[in-house]
Amino acid sequence: MSLPERPGGSPVYEHRNVYRNSPSRRPRPNDIETGFQSVPRAGHERGKSVSSYAETISNPHANTETLPLSPTHPTASPPPHSPDQPFTRKRSLIRPERNRIDKDHRNYHYHKHAANMETMPSSTGNDPILENVDVSTEPSGGSQTHGSFADSSPPRHHRSRKMSGDDQEKGNTRVKSRPRRSKSGKITKETRHRKSRKNPATAEQIRPPSAWNVYCAIVTFWCPDFMLKCCGKPTKAQRRAWREKMGLISIILVIMAIVGFLTFGFTATVCSAPPERLRVNKVTGGYMIFHGVAYDLSTSHHPPAEGIPLRQDGTGANVLFDLPEKHSGQDGSFLFQNVNGHCKGLINKAPGSDVPTNSDNELAWYFPCTTFNQDGSSRPNFTNPYYLGYACHTSANARNAFYVGLKGAADVYFTWDDIRNSSRNLVVYSGSVLDLNLLNWFNESEISVPDRFKVLRDQDSAVNKAIRGRDVTRMFQSPGDKQVAQCLEEITRVGFVDTETVGCIASKVVLYCALILILSVVGTRFVLALIFQWFISRKYAASKTSQSSDRRKRAKQIEDWSEDIYRAPARLPGDVGSSAMGSSDRTSKRGSSFLPTTSRFSAVYGSDRPTGARRLPTTMSSQGPASALLNPNSIYRQGNDSRASFLRPDPYSSAASPSDGPGPAGFIHDSVVPQPPSDWMPFGFPLAHTMCLVTAYSEGEEGIRTTLDSIAMTDYPNSHKAIVVICDGIIKGKGEAVSTPDVCLGMMKDHATPPDMVESFSYVAVASGSKRHNMAKVYCGFYDYGNKSRIPVEKQQRVPMMLIVKCGTPDEADKAKPGNRGKRDSQIILMSFLQKVMFDERMTELEYEMFNGLWKVTGISPDYYEIVLMVDADTKVFPDSLTHMVSAMVKDPEIMGLCGETKIANKRDSWVTAIQVFEYFISHHLAKSFESVFGGVTCLPGCFCMYRIKAPKGGQNYWVPILANPDVVEHYSENVVETLHEKNLYLLGEDRYLTTLMLRTFPKRKQVFVPQAVCKTTVPDKFMVLLSQRRRWINSTVHNLMELILVRDLCGTFCFSMQFVVFVELVGTLVLPAAIAFTFYVVITSIIHSPPQIIPLVLLALILGLPGLLILVTAHSWSYVVWMLIYLVSLPIWNFVLPTYAFWKFDDFSWGDTRKTAGDKVKKGGIEYQGEFDSSKITMKRWAEFEREKRARSAYFGSRENVVGAPGGWAVPPSHAQTDGYYSDA
């Protein structure tokens, strides 16, 4: 077997053996396509350094132009195929790992970064299979000065690798190209030219208007630009935002109209008011029934006849009330018989009959001309009161008066229960109810009837039993039977079956489907929220912390603690996990490391087969040697006193190493918190290094002190947490004596560099125009609790702290807010830094200082950090919250983000704070608990959340970036924000948009809510401040839900999916004002009119009552019942006032009254473009290049006397040749 070779040292893939391209060859584990690589064999190459930087092997193609990161560059795409080259393997539509990665792919930027990373040498003698990647590529296009040095570094053993398609994360993202950089680390003029072409003013002239802009122009055609200029919209961006706002409002109004139509208008439209109908046996008063129709005869007058005299007023008598025999409510069908129709030929005159006939042998009547009861209780009566044919109304005048002069008032209907009544002999034919007992009224001495009638009326016959109480329409379809049925319909119809129109049936179907859907969503959310609270959430929590293990007692302590923002917890962290030194072996959970866990026959990359023993979760510390985490002064260290031994390939070598000098390894702070062994588990799970990011803007000393105290006093070990504070500009809060950066700097001690010697460094900010260039200072040290601290001295813990102050360029030193670029820019500073560290990419001078500074005060490389906690500067964290959050992250590697519960500390300050208490409660314990079941929490609040920087993937030592993923960083750092949608995402709801971006990039990973993690904060106590805050939150919610609804890969399918839940939530948010108006309308109409609308009232009771039930079954404080009642009273504010104001302020991108500063003037953000970005002021190089130049500027590396706590000194400065290996290693 040949020696291992570097990928660039052998022919390209297409020139090698054709067998590797053959379909008959099965993929091997060491192929790049499979996502795995072999571990280099010992003895053929230099041993791997345990430093936190990648080994670099010299590049034989050092002069080859590197592949730029920018996907728009022509050399970024693979070279076209030439005829003299062998055909390469075609891409398949079936295998997902071979899908085309274009600009619309969710992992586009990640693939670009991964493609530019060098690979480790192969131990099999075969080169890794690389597709569409130049052989000689340099990651991030690093500069190659000092020709003898090779700066192309392969990824470390724990760096992210390009995985197979099945392992790649999925999601759809919008792509933004990265600028191309020159070899010197500067952004080229071509980039500036491309930037100028992206100027909104010129872009709008070239780019054709989109369908959305055309729609907005049509909606607002009535308001031309000159009118908007007169109304305070002078700039084009403001006018465009206003038109887009009106377009959105028009769509919201249409949705409200649709919901209103479905609620009230749909039934009235498709099921209009039917004609009046009267149920059988309910026809009374002035009605009389004829052939199934009730006629109103209460005001009728019958002409004089036998037995019907004139009244005293000379008018005819009323046949219902004036005669001795009352006929009100009776059936008079025999008085106006339907003869000689379909019955002609079936019913004939009997021999010797007195029934009159005409020349066509048509009979004058069939039945005796009398009335009968509508309930069918009358018996046949064949007597004639006065003369033959009395009351038969056979004259033309009489029949015209009835058939033409009278109009039916209502149909008489039978329900199917009435038809199945055993005392009646009823059947249904073509919707008409026929009474077969009326066939018994035939006087067979006068009339001859067919035998079929006799069989049908006989209740003892088999035929009658088969059809009685049923619909016989289908049974009487033959020609002979159809005539019989039609004849029966003419002479025996007593009413109609109870039916509804198709429209009424459709309206009921829609109503009940909507009811079932809403009840299902509401009920499912409630049940799944309970399941999460009772069962799922408990597996995320730490088994033990410094607080009480009794859940009820702990809940009571939290409620008492949250009553006041400055109230201390019931128990301060003590022995458990306070530091690496603070726990005894009895409280630690350590496993034995004496016996080996692998052998030479073990799989290199691990096995996916389940084992009998439960494997511990994977962390950075657990994958590497424990000694790699230790600093020179660690009590766990034995032997070598210099960290340089960890940077050398051979720790026992006697050769000098350049890292023994004053580099990052040379002046680690003497007070650094020692690192414990990797198997030390004080809480029952492996520890993971965590950054605690605190973003500050204009907060005062009291607010910041509260936050930092709570973070520093969490019971999570100080060896595994570091506080990172980023101040967004030199800003002084309203009523404060000093600026916020000065306040934060005063809370530090034991600085690695004296504060007065700290310089400002440049970086690329998230802004437009000249503000893209910003400068910041990096202060590193330890947290200082202060002389007046409420925390006892013996409880104060030593926590490393790094302060980043955005001070701005010298040009803006005299402006109101120098350095201010927004909270998103502060987050991007850290996220971009983490990306550069993980991929070993070129970084700015600021990031280089952050790297070294963090290493100084923590004693470990920044790429050991796996998790970042994000906290606002006015939030206080419960002591064991950080432990519970890290526990969830470590126990479930699929979790990429989580949040805890935020409680209100000023509940009783005013009615404004009182109405927010239950709203906060229900948003966490109902909404977020439900979403956590599916791992899709749609909003991780920026005041208290945690994200995973990178996650273990696949086999041993493989990690994929999560928060540090290039796709997340690229999209979150978008600085060209033009549309109303983008401005609401990036300028108002950046915290929520980060959550959306994570779900969109990694739809198969989880974002959950950890109820055991609790923080408290103060909420607005004035209505105008609340109005301004909720304006931002509601508008951000709408636009983020619009983004999430397009993500198809979320959990579930169709109506049983998170995508459908997001759709329902979006529609529910948009129609909130209409919904509360409809609710009041239903309640008022139900009180005034009768009968009440039962279904809407029941639905309303369920929606409003289930949250109260949630309080009871989850055993929360009974005080929340009172807060719920206050919330219900304030529903018009939550559902009408706040959403309506927010929708009307869609084009307002300012933060309003939420954050006040000294001399602040509220402006609408996101609409100014000031100056031009000069990229030449920003230098970007890899860490090794920065470090080389820094050391080259010194005549020698310095003496050990200059290093804090370092014994001994340098006798002779090391030669330049001795540093070559180190630089390539770094």
Swiss-Prot record:
Compartments annotated for it: namely: Cell membrane
Task: Give start-end positions of Basic and acidic residues composition bias.
Answer: 94-107, 163-172
One term of GO molecular function: chitin synthase activity
Q: Could you tell me what reaction this enzyme catalyses?
A: [(1->4)-N-acetyl-beta-D-glucosaminyl](n) + UDP-N-acetyl-alpha-D-glucosamine = [(1->4)-N-acetyl-beta-D-glucosaminyl](n+1) + UDP + H(+)
Give the residue spans that cross the bilayer: 246-266, 516-536, 1060-1080, 1094-1114, 1118-1138
Q: Which UniProt keywords apply?
A: Cell membrane, Glycoprotein, Glycosyltransferase, Membrane, Transferase, Transmembrane, Transmembrane helix
The enzyme's first-digit EC class, named in words, is: transferase
Question: Which segments show compositional bias classed as Polar residues?
Answer: 49-65, 134-151, 580-601, 618-643
Function comment: Polymerizes chitin, a structural polymer of the cell wall and septum, by transferring the sugar moiety of UDP-GlcNAc to the non-reducing end of the growing chitin polymer. Contributes to the production of conidia and the ability of fungal conidia to germinate. Involved in fungal stress tolerances.
Q: Which family does it belong to?
A: Belongs to the chitin synthase family. Class IV subfamily.
Q: By what name is this protein known?
A: Chitin synthase IV
Q: Which organism is it from?
A: Metarhizium acridum (strain CQMa 102)
